[in-house]
Amino acid sequence: MGRDLRPGSRVLLLLLLLLLVYLTQPGNGNEGSVTGSCYCGKRISSDSPPSVQFMNRLRKHLRAYHRCLYYTRFQLLSWSVCGGNKDPWVQELMSCLDLKECGHAYSGIVAHQKHLLPTSPPISQASEGASSDIHTPAQMLLSTLQSTQRPTLPVGSLSSDKELTRPNETTIHTAGHSLAAGPEAGENQKQPEKNAGPTARTSATVPVLCLLAIIFILTAALSYVLCKRRRGQSPQSSPDLPVHYIPVAPDSNT
């Protein structure tokens, strides 16, 4: 049968065999063929495991993993990483994703929970204030004794208290002045707006009037040209032609 094949058919058969061998070769990070469904953007060998920084990056941006024939593919946002099924870092990432302790979705949930957590210091302060308000009978008795044993304040302290109240009075006066100045400032702001109103209207009417004047001049010039053309095209009055009389001989019968 080999003798019956022509040289051209032998070459064609050889090319088909070479193409079949090329397609069955394993590609870069793709077991089976170049056009397989388990493609890897980066293949990490078992002899050189990834660094700690790279592992942290994978834990943060990892989305899913797929089990292939001899390796596992980890899918990230725009690329993929593959490693052997029995590699320790592969097993660690797989268990982390199964337990939902890492990955892109887990980092989003953690960030959302941080925003929702309430602040604890105000609650503790409120509880401390509530506990300080509760007094035992012994504490109340001590407070009354201390209040009765307090010495009376001298006159100088009273004058100092009065001096301390003066800044408050000055602040009240300044606040009243600012409140009174508020409506005046509003009226002063309204007056420039009222003055600016007529000027804006006049500035808007000036171009309109100029446009109307230009249109009027153009229509007058056009009507003048048309009237001049009509006068030139009208038939001029022709002069009177002379009348020629032919003498007629008188009839002999008459």
UniProtKB/Swiss-Prot annotation:
Q: Listed GO molecular functions?
A: chemokine activity; low-density lipoprotein particle receptor activity; scavenger receptor activity
Q: Which residues lie on this side of the membrane: Extracellular?
A: 30-205
Q: Which residues are glycosylated?
A: 168
The way it spans or sits in the membrane comes to: Single-pass type I membrane protein
Where does the entry say this protein is expressed, by tissue? Expressed in T-cell areas. Expressed in spleen, lymph nodes, lung, kidney, small intestine and thymus. Weak expression in heart and liver and no expression in brain and bone marrow.
Q: What is this protein called?
A: C-X-C motif chemokine 16
Give the source species: Homo sapiens (Human)
Disulfide linkages recorded for this protein, renumbered to the chain, are 38-68, 40-82
To which protein family does this belong?
Belongs to the intercrine alpha (chemokine CxC) family.
- Disordered: where is this region? 146-165, 178-200, 231-254
Query: Region entry Chemokine: which residue ranges?
Result: 32-107
Tell me, in a sentence or two, what this protein's role is.
Acts as a scavenger receptor on macrophages, which specifically binds to OxLDL (oxidized low density lipoprotein), suggesting that it may be involved in pathophysiology such as atherogenesis. Induces a strong chemotactic response. Induces calcium mobilization. Binds to CXCR6/Bonzo.
Which InterPro entries does the entry mention?
CXCL16, CXCL16_dom
- What's one GO-annotated cellular component? extracellular space
Q: Which gene encodes it?
A: CXCL16
**Which keywords annotate this record?**
Cell membrane, Chemotaxis, Cytokine, Disulfide bond, Glycoprotein, Membrane, Secreted, Signal, Transmembrane, Transmembrane helix
In what way is this protein post-translationally modified?
Glycosylated.
Cytoplasmic-side positions = 227-254
Give TM segment ranges.
206-226
UniProt main location, coarse? membrane
Question: What's a BP term from Gene Ontology annotated to this protein?
Answer: chemotaxis
Q: Where in the cell is it found?
A: Cell membrane; Secreted
Extent of the signal sequence: 1-29
